[in-house]
Amino acid sequence: MKEPKDNEVRRSEFIDAAEKLFRENGIVDTTVNSIVKELDVAKGLFYYYFKSKDDVIEAISEKYNRDFKQAIQRSLDPSNDFEERLNGFLENTIVSFRTLWDNLQGKNETIDLTILSTRSLEEAKQTASEKLTELLKEGNELKRMNIPNPEYFSKMIVSGIADLAGHAESDLREIKKMIDELIGKAGK
């Protein structure tokens, strides 16, 4: 008989197994039965942790976004000056979106992870936009820039970062350079 596991450990195992199967087979073609078979557990155990396959999709999205938030938060250390925080934030955001896109790729181009990618990307864009808005408002208050509408500007910048980071051929340094130029031009 198998040893019982801690609830969080077991829940994480379900999330990891579902994530693996989604990447291999797509979300539509991955069933609850295939997830429990992957873990060699009873189907009822799945339903102890999740109401449905959609709950697992949401849990994976939450995991990705928790990682995304932690990555960009590291650059917002209040002991750093404004320019260091802005540059660090932009660099971490670009890398974090690339990582998120990498996580949202199936084993081949026919694998459809649209449900998961839409949820994850929208939440990540919202988080990054809110943080960038705060930074731009601070830059305006410090007279380091003059961005007329920080909220709209942030949404535009973050959407561009998210889109460009999703293309494997995109050079992350080039994305950062373009963003710096846009902020520099808009902030005059």
Q: Which positions does each model-derived feature cover?
A:
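Short secondary-structure transition hinges
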Residues: 92-133, 141, 162
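Short coil/turn segments at alpha/beta junctions that flank glycine-rich nucleotide-binding fingerprints
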Residues: 24-28, 79, 100, 142
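Membrane-interface starts of transmembrane alpha-helices
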Residues: 146, 150-154
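Helix-turn-helix
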Residues: 13, 21-55, 59
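N-terminal intrinsically disordered/low-complexity leader segments
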Residues: 1-9
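Hydrophobic alpha-helical connector segments
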Residues: 59, 70-99, 153-157
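Hydrophobic/aromatic residues within well-ordered alpha-helical segments
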Residues: 10, 53, 60, 64-68, ...
